[in-house]
Every structure is written in C-alpha cells, then in structure tokens.
Regions:
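Extended, hydrophobic interaction surfaces within ordered domains
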Residues: 5-32, 339, 349-398
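Extracellular "leader-to-stem" segments immediately downstream of a signal peptide or signal-anchor
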Residues: 1-134, 138-190, 247-248, 393, ...
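Extracellular beta-strand/beta-solenoid scaffold signature
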Residues: 80, 85, 118-123, 144-179, ...
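Right-handed parallel beta-helix
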Residues: 130-139, 182-195, 208-219, 231-249, ...
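A structural signal for short secondary-structure junctions
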Residues: 311-314, 323, 333-335, 345, ...
Length: 486
C-alpha cells in the first residue's frame, strides 16, 4: 500500500501543475481580452465630442472636456456655458412642474477645478430641473461686470425686481406672472464663488426648490446670494464674506455689500456664517425662516446690520437660534415675526423701525443679551413712533450689561402713607402704553402698625407715561406689588 502511494504522488503533482498552468494561461488570455475591450471603449468615448456624449445620454457633464481650464490660467466662461447648454439639451419626456423638463439628475462636475470667469454663467432659458452642479471654484476676472453675478438662474422672460420692491409689488407681480417657475430642483454644492470685488455670487429668479449647500462666497460687492420671486430656496452650511477675516478686521468700517438677500417667499437659511459685509441678511419676502446663523459682519456701531427684516406690515418671519455678534437685527413694521433662543453679543440688539407705525404679532422671547455695562444699550430699541401695537410679547430674556426692555413689568413698592408709585418707563418698550394692570395691596397696619387700619380702601388713581399710582384713603404701612402689560 505504501509503495502505491509513493508511486501515485508524482502523477498527482503532475496533474495539479498541468491544471494550474492551464488556469494561468486562461486567466492571462482573459485579462488580455478585457484590456483590449476597455481600450476600445475608451477610444470610442474619446472620439466623441463632449456635446455628442451629453446628448447621447451621459449623466455626467465635465466642463473641462469643453475646453474649460481647471488651472484658471485661461477664461472658462464659454466652455462652462456650453456644458450647461448640453446638459439642458438632454432628451427627457418627464416633467417636474408643468413645463419644467426633468433632466433626470444630470451632474455638472467641476472636478475640483479653479475656473476664471469673465462673464456670468447664465443658465439656459428653457425651463428645466433635477440637475446638480458641484465641486470646484469660480473666480471672477478683472473683466467681470460689477453689476452681475457669477452664476445666474433667470430666464429671458423673467422680470427682475427693483431694490425697493414692497409687498404690494411682489403680490402684483405674482398675479401678473402667468409663466411661473422656470427652474426647479437645481443643486449647487461644494463650490467656492469668488467674485473678485466684481459683482455678486449667485442670482436666482422665478425658481422653486433650489439648494445651495456647503458653498463659500467671497469678495462680493453686491450680494453673495440674491433670490427674487419663486419660493423654497434652501441655503445651508455656507460661509459668506466680502473679505476673508475671522473678526476684528482693521477695515471693518469699509465693509459693503449684502451676504444674502431674499425677495422671495418660503425660503430657509440654515447653519450659515457671515463674516464680513455691510448687511448680513435682507428679507423682503414672507414666510422665511432663519436658523443657526452666526452674523459677525460689520458691527452695528460702524453702521452695519446683521439681519434686516423688510416687507413692512407683512413680514411673517421666524428667526431662531441665531448668534448676533456685535451686529443688530432691524425690523420694519414687523407683523407676525418671532425672534427666539438667540445670543446677542457686544451690545447687539433688536431695533424696531417705524414705516407706517404698525406692529402686530411680534414675539421676542428666550434670548440672551450681553454688552458693555457702562453703555447700557437697550436690548430692544424703537426707531420712530408706533401708533398701532397689538399682540406684542417681549419677555423672558436674560440680560447682562445691557438695558432690559420688556412688554411686561413687575415691581413691588413699600411705603408708609397714602400713595405708592411704580415707574416702568425704564423697562417697558413702548412709551406711555399700559394696556393691563394687576396689583396686590399688602397692609401691615397704620403708621404705627395699628391693626385698625389694615383694611383700607385703595385704588389705581393714575396711569401716565408708564407710571402707575395706587392710593389709599387712609395712611397705612403697606406693600403694593404691580404687574403691567403692554
């Protein structure tokens, strides 16, 4: 038996070696065939022009293949515009909104390039959506026009708004705009927009559900982001500044421009840092929400504004969980606006500016204010006179080194006599305005603690200039606790 095993082993090894050699030759031949096929496909792919590839159904468009210079040495405006035109020309039977072609998620990939731009990258006027532009840098050249934006989404039939458009203008424009939305579901992500002190970053008109995510806007002189008309533009996780600084810039007094301006409804600004500009955010539309924003643009002491809420009388705006760093919130005739859970540093406050003297549905609650105790800047200040005030609650704010202001006042006054005076003029926001009064009268007896005078008639006898007076018909040693509301 042992002899048989010994004689069999050489034959077994010979078979194994032959099998391995055969497998190796087959694997080598297969690899050779695969390489030849890949080379053939690559040659076919390279033989097509970029426009033919896009029209043929490719879902990724590379501007570099159209002649865009990723190094920034040459102008790439025309190449990027041509790439967008080919992306918009992709055949599709599907639609998003009526008349808006669904491009199926086509991707315009900047491939991390640094592109020099001499004219705006204007999207085609044909209505379309479901497209992504990502991953690169767009820099304005010295020839770039100072009144335009690096990227512009507006159709030739769209109507641009003036800088002073009011709610009535927006409302009438909406009624007179039968053609509606031209762009939908377009995403910009991971892009640096460097305007080179020539104009702005991105301009969006008559569009719906636009996303601007994880982008950086630098060196703008007009607006970093400007949105007009349409609705539901979501701006998130972005940084915006005219000058690259981390605060305390020696040229802060000269900061100009606006980081974000929304002349549009139903938009959201989330998790944004604005580090240099004259104005951080301008809101000229309704039903917008601003949350998680850090504004340390030009300080209010230098004439800057962190957030400006316009659209007097129709604001309907929510500002939550924001950090106002030496820069104020200014609201014009705010109606249905709330400011909550914010942090105001360096005498940053909230200014209510009168246009027609109307305030309604305003809520400023649960915020923290910190400032210079020597200045005692009021946390809420009035700019003008308000004659129509309704449903305003300013309360429950914590204050350190600034002047507390509220629409609710509490005070206890002790005295031995017939009159108790509570002065709320240093606390209440609106002058000479108290709508509700509650008070409790605690009598400790007569002037000599005579119990015979513990129960005496008393009443509010005067309410003028936010001063409340309570009087009794007999002298008494008592404490009066007041609660007033505006």
């Amino acid at each position: 038996m042992m002899r048989f095993l010994i004689s069999f082993l050489p034959f077994f090894f010979l078979v194994v070696v032959l099998q391995e050699a055969t497998c190796f030759n087959q694997h080598k031949e297969l690899s050779h065939n695969i390489r030849n096929k890949l080379k053939g496909r690559l040659a076919i792919s390279l033989s097509h022009s970029p426009s033919q590839t896009a029209k043929g159904g490719s879902r990724v468009v590379y501007p570099a293949e159209y002649g865009a210079d990723t190094s920034g040495a040459r102008d790439s405006s025309d190449a990027i515009i041509k790439a967008l035109e080919d992306a918009f020309s992709l055949e599709s039977e599907a639609e998003l909104l009526p008349g808006v072609k669904d491009l199926g998620g086509v991707l315009v990939d900047l491939q991390g390039g640094n592109y020099t731009i001499s004219k705006p990258i204007k999207f085609p006027s044909s209505a379309a959506g479901n497209l992504v532009v990502q991953g690169g840098t767009l820099r304005a050249s010295d020839a770039f026009p100072t009144d335009r934006h690096l990227v512009e989404l507006w159709a030739s039939s769209s109507q641009k708004l003036s800088k002073t458009a009011s709610f009535d203008d927006l409302y009438n424009r909406k009624l007179q705009q039968p053609k509606g939305i031209y762009y939908e579901d377009i995403t910009f992500r991971d892009i640096l927009f460097d305007s080179g002190y020539h104009g702005g970053g991105i301009f969006v008109v008559d569009s719906a559900r636009i996303r601007i995510n994880n982008c950086f806007f630098l060196h703008f002189t007009t607006e970093g982001i400007l949105v007009q008309g349409g609705h539901e533009t979501y701006i998130s996780s972005c940084f915006l500044g005219q000058h690259s600084t981390v605060g305390g810039d020696s040229g802060e007094r000269q900061f100009s421009g606006t980081a974000i301006e929304l002349a549009s409804n139903d938009n959201a600004i989330t998790d944004i840092a604005i580090f240099s500009s004259a104005v951080g955010i301008v809101l000229r539309g309704q039903a917008n929400i601003v949350t998680g924003v850090h504004c340390y643009n030009k300080a209010t002491g230098f004439g800057g504004i962190g957030i400006l809420v316009m659209l007097a009388g129709n604001s309907q705006t929510r500002i939550d969980n924001c950090y106002m760093d030496y820069t104020a919130i200014v609201m014009e005739d705010p109606v249905q606006v709330h400011v909550t859970n914010g942090f105001f540093l360096g005498d940053a406050n909230i200014v209510l500016k009168s246009i027609k003297g109307q305030i309604s549905g305003l809520k400023i609650v649960n915020n923290m204010f910190t400032g210079n105790p020597n200045a005692k800047v009021p946390i809420v200040a009035l700019d003008g006179v308000f004659g129509n005030v309704d449903q305003v609650v300013i309360d429950l704010n914590s204050v350190d080194g600034m002047g507390l202001r509220s629409t609710v006042g509490k005070q206890s006054v002790a005295g031995n006599g017939t009159k108790w005076v509570a002065d709320f003029s240093g606390v209440l926001v609106f002058p000479n305005r108290i709508n509700h009064i509650q008070y409790s009268f605690y009598s400790q007896g007569g002037p000599n603690n005579n119990n015979n005078n513990k129960f005496v008639p008393h009443a509010v006898t005067n309410v003028t200039n936010n001063v409340v007076v309570v009087e009794s018909d007999k002298p008494v040693n008592g404490v009066v606790s007041f609660l007033v509301e505006q």
